[in-house]
Amino acid sequence: MTRNIDPIELAKALIAVPSVTPATGAVFDVLEAALTPLGFTVERFIDGIEPDGPVENLLAVRRGSGPKHFGFAGHLDVVPPGVGWTSDAFAPEIRGELLYGRGAVDMKGAIAAFVAAAAATPVDAGTISLIITGDEEGPAIFGTRALMEHMDARRVTPDMIVVGEPTSVNRLGDMVKIGRRGSVNIWIDVPGTQGHVAYPHLADNPIPKLVKILAAIDAVVLDEGSDWFQPSNIEFTDIEVGNGATNVIPASARARLSIRFNDQHRGAELVAMIERIAHEVEPAARVLGKISGEAFLTPPGELSELVAEAIHAETDICAEMSTTGGTSDARFLHALCPVVEFGLTNATMHKLDEAVAIEDLHRLTAIYRGILMRVFL
């Protein structure tokens, strides 16, 4: 037995509910109302506390008689719309061939497409899970990671997962993500002794020390890339001394840097490397690292092949398998099973007048259904 769900109408219903990260409440009501008639058992959880919570997460499972278990992961939270939209960001509007609204691309549209695809898939074909968080765009502390704990407690473990991130670049289907680089942010704090610039012998200026540290870091070449990854890179993102006076040597100097790294490195090793460099210049320097995620790769195989086949069948495009771009919740989910990311074109995500082509939503629905049928049959 199958049902028909219009992905356009469901996308509009989801977009119409403001859900700036972290998202809770009404937007999950809309999704639950769509899933329950399809035979899904829906559980919702409130995880975390301020300042990074509370976050709402949703796990929906429809068990079938087939042996395979397919998971779809996504997020209902969106980034703030900002000012300057042609129309209300949370009043979905179709103009021409495009559906406008915050989340149309990233990623309420993809969630709507997958629900429509699941509705068109026979209930007994196999087990389908939806793993949906309200915190992917924010700190992601109480989002998918917390949801995975609920999955573990319920012994919900898909054989494979597709994350509905907007991976396509120029045309729907031109790119699938099979991995992502890792990400670590590092803060360096060099202490000094405040004093008058006319009496430098009575002070200890931390700025020259910080400059030496940053120069040494800038000279580091982490690698030349690997089979599936581009070279790792270190980027300085902030330098600050908090000194508004022209005649005062500051008491401290701070810098922040971000490293995007491939599968040749681990986040903790990179933090330790930066700490060694800093301490060679100033033993009292303080270094703090925050790892957002490790690099991961799902080597080309069954999952990427069936996704590519479904894309080609609908679009006649041979999708590129890639690891470019920023981080996503796939960095957590890959610990469960093979994971790839595939969704809409990303040209307008996080931008004013975010929009998705109506045709692309229908095509994505067909591709997702093609993936499900290839998994289950």
Curated annotation (Swiss-Prot):
This enzyme's EC code(s): 3.5.1.18
CDD domains listed in its UniProt record: M20_DapE_proteobac (cd03891)
InterPro entries: ArgE/DapE_CS, Bact_exopeptidase_dim_dom, DapE_proteobac, Peptidase_M20, Peptidase_M20_dimer, Peptidase_M20A
Cofactor entry: Zn(2+); Co(2+)
Pathway: Amino-acid biosynthesis; L-lysine biosynthesis via DAP pathway; LL-2,6-diaminopimelate from (S)-tetrahydrodipicolinate (succinylase route): step 3/3
Residues annotated for Zn(2+) 2 binding in this entry: 106, 137, 350
Cofactor note as given: Binds 2 Zn(2+) or Co(2+) ions per subunit.
Binding site for Zn(2+) 1: 75, 106, 165
Catalytic activity annotation: N-succinyl-(2S,6S)-2,6-diaminopimelate + H2O = (2S,6S)-2,6-diaminopimelate + succinate
Stored HAMAP family: DapE
Protein name: Succinyl-diaminopimelate desuccinylase
